[in-house]
Amino acid sequence: MAYRKRGARREANLNNNDRMQEKNDEKQDSNKIQLSDKVLSKKEEVVTDSHEEVKITDEVKKSTKEESKQLLEVLKTKEEHQKEIQYEILQKTIPTFEPKETILRKLEDIKPELAKKQTKLFRIFEPKQLPIYRANGERELRNRWYWKLKKDTLPDGDYDVREYFLNLYDQVLTEMPDYLLLKDMAVENKNSRDAGKVVDSETASICDAIFQDEETEGAVRRFIAEMRQRVQADRNVVNYPSILHPIDYAFNEYFLQHQLVEPLNNDIIFNYIPERIRNDVNYILNMDRNLPSTARYIRPNLLQDRLNLHDNFESLWDTITTSNYILARSVVPDLKELVSTEAQIQKMSQDLQLEALTIQSETQFLTGINSQAANDCFKTLIAAMLSQRTMSLDFVTTNYMSLISGMWLLTVVPNDMFIRESLVACQLAIVNTIIYPAFGMQRMHYRNGDPQTPFQIAEQQIQNFQVANWLHFVNNNQFRQAVIDGVLNQVLNDNIRNGHVINQLMEALMQLSRQQFPTMPVDYKRSIQRGILLLSNRLGQLVDLTRLLAYNYETLMACITMNMQHVQTLTTEKLQLTSVTSLCMLIGNATVIPSPQTLFHYYNVNVNFHSNYNERINDAVAIITAANRLNLYQKKMKAIVEDFLKRLYIFDVSRVPDDQMYRLRDRLRLLPVEIRRLDIFNLILMNMDQIERASDKIAQGVIIAYRDMHLERDEMYGYVNIARNLEGFQQINLEELMRSGDYAQITNMLLNNQPVALVGALPFITDSSVISLIAKLDATVFAQIVKLRKVDTLKPILYKINSDSNDFYLVANYDWVPTSTTKVYKQVPQQFDFRNSMHMLTSNLTFTVYSDLLAFVSADTVEPINAVAFDNMRIMNEL
């Protein structure tokens, strides 16, 4: 049906064209005379190139009507051409993924994370004073110190507690310092005899509180007075006293032992510069030799892409290549000293006016030629190859000059860089417009979906050696993959790098221009020959342009740190063939090469993004592994993956398809956990009980009995229904009970007068009013489980009677022994012991961390005119 409709539309267009033709028959003769007068006129017309556009002078403005008619013809021809191409080639519909402008920023806008420098020690615990109660519930005057959580936010429920530990792990990963300098966080010990220092302000405040506590032993006070730093200047080492919970000490000691900083010297800076830049004779590099012995740096994490984002992650790959493309365009140098557009157009006009009457199609040869388009084309080609962005070609078949320029483009840029449909359309236009008519061959009727391209078909049918040889080169023009300094690079063919392939192209073009075009009118043959002549007149400049393109591409490619994987992108970079014509016709003889500052900037941005990318992968892998080991079966892995992508900054996470998210999750699961992150997780895993028992928010379970149990004395609370151990009780895990929903076992045990312990994280609720407690105690616990069967609403109440309680007089006056059918199981927090909490921490006395290693390198270039390519010959030889 599609073909039938298109055919009908073409017939309608042809009928309209016939009617217009009849109306314009009378005017054609006069138009031809006016056009011939204009072409043969010797009167000079001045063309300027202000604002990068060709402006038309007063002389030309007089014939605006004539030009508008010509423009109508051009537009009509272009429209017919587009319909023809659509008729011959069914356009393949591909999914589009347009990143939002607000999300997609240049990679250079993403600032590298500064080395995380900790200004205080990592702490989970802090010591707190709690009162002591006598056997009768009265409060004593003395206190006791216990380790409690600094930030007590533990939720109730075993699953939620495990999720809390995952969040704690994530927090530790975020805060984990790259290096520690204890000197920067040390503060004065107010109680020191000789103005000594302790490791941080919290240690100092703990020392103050203990020193002022009346119950502190004299020996401890004397020890605090002696607490000070110990410096070993010859070894650049300093020891500071600290007061830390054993778990906090384990964390901080691990951070100190596994710092990421490494000594920095000139060799490291020298090797940090990409080898090809170091060995490039066009760049003169000097290094500052005055590095102090305390200089340090953090080695960037440049592991190659472990996720293979190019494989089945179309949306992600499109975004990352687009970001790379935007960055690459900003570092490609601007072309200088281009041929004056005015002078070049005048020269081209003279070449086109060698014979009497210029035919219609030749008037298009000059359209769109300007220096801005030339510069834009140069940047687009290099940036697309650097970022491996797929390009699509935009052209008009009747503009033979564009097609001839396209032949140069297809010669120097590998086929893979163009989207298949666009490549086929361009090749088909070149074959049917230039190559086949030259040899009198019939038009090629290309079938959509043919595995061979038009050039591959033409190569088998063309007998002329030079043309077939050129077609063979284009058909086999692919990137050569080479691993350089551990990075996969896409390298151009040597014949392109040295420009020799242009001679091959010119031989083919000259052969085509010598052919008779037997099936075409003479004017057609003349137009093609003139177009070829225009390009062949610039043979030397085209060789230089090709060498310049290859040199800039390879020099900038040396600064890329991630593997250059070649995969077709969802969206493409559009390239007008008229801009390729501008580049070919306007390229001058001025060499442009990237400045050293530009190269260093490009290299630093690539290193920063690559290193951040790997660190975020390590974080995501660690969190996923931790979630699995903590048995967080309800955890949404997609949320972890989304968080990972957000931390890379360049992705519009909400628009990434779900299938790619889950594929990313699966690949992250396969990666091993980085050793530092694994050790930190094991530290948390081993000490979960210690952290949990230091919380005042939750209890560890509840004991339920059918008959009342007496309240017992507890040093921390007075008379309470608290159990400190579960010996002698049958235990049932609350989480498993809630998941199974089978309460028969509990009911039977209680009816048989056997107390049962439900073990799990429960809210630790205190209610000091005895009167209110008596009324609701049994209902809140026993009734809910046995009757309502809702364990998730279980909130055991801590029944506490002491001298701080309003109801203490009940016990004192009436000798009443309170009882309860429940007991809250609460583990005892760790008691604070000064001797066990005093630790000496050791670090370097001083060092300086340098983030930008290339700041030590001063660089310059040779005079651009003397710049040489890989073959030790000048990049631009045509002077």
From Swiss-Prot:
* Chief localisation class: virion
Q: Where is this site: Interaction with the intermediate capsid protein VP6?
A: 219, 223, 227, 838, 840
Q: Where is region (5-fold hub) located?
A: 1-79
Which terms in the GO cellular component ontology are assigned? T=2 icosahedral viral capsid; viral inner capsid; viral nucleocapsid
Q: Does the keyword Cell membrane apply?
A: no
Keywords, sorted A to Z: Capsid protein, Inner capsid protein, Repeat, RNA-binding, T=2 icosahedral capsid protein, Ubl conjugation, Virion
| PTMs per UniProt | Sumoylated with SUMO1 and SUMO2. Sumoylation of viral proteins seems to have a positive role on viral replication.
Q: Which GO terms describe its molecular function?
A: RNA binding
Q: Where in the cell is it found?
A: Virion
Return the annotated region ranges for Hydrophobic: 393-413, 421-441
Q: Where is this region: Disordered?
A: 1-35
InterPro entries listed in its UniProt record: Rotavirus_VP2
Q: Where is the composition biased (Basic and acidic residues)?
A: 19-30
- How does the annotation summarize its subunit structure? Homodecamer; each decamer is made up of two conformers of VP2, called VP2A and VP2B. Interacts with a VP1-VP3 complex. Interacts with the intermediate capsid protein VP6. Interacts with NSP5. Interacts (via N-terminus) with NSP2.
Domain statement: The N-terminus binds RNA. It is necessary for encapsidation of VP1 and VP3. The N-termini of 10 VP2 molecules form a cylindrical hub underneath each 5-fold axis of the inner capsid.
Chain's role: Inner capsid protein that self-assembles to form an icosahedral capsid with a T=2 symmetry, which consists of 120 copies of VP2, with channels at each of its five-fold vertices. This capsid constitutes the innermost concentric layer of the viral mature particle. It encapsidates the polymerase VP1, the capping enzyme VP3 and the genomic dsRNA, thereby defining the core.
Q: Which family does it belong to?
A: Belongs to the rotavirus VP2 family.
Q: What is this protein called?
A: Inner capsid protein VP2
Native organism is Rotavirus A (strain RVA/Human/Japan/S2/1980/G2P1B[4])
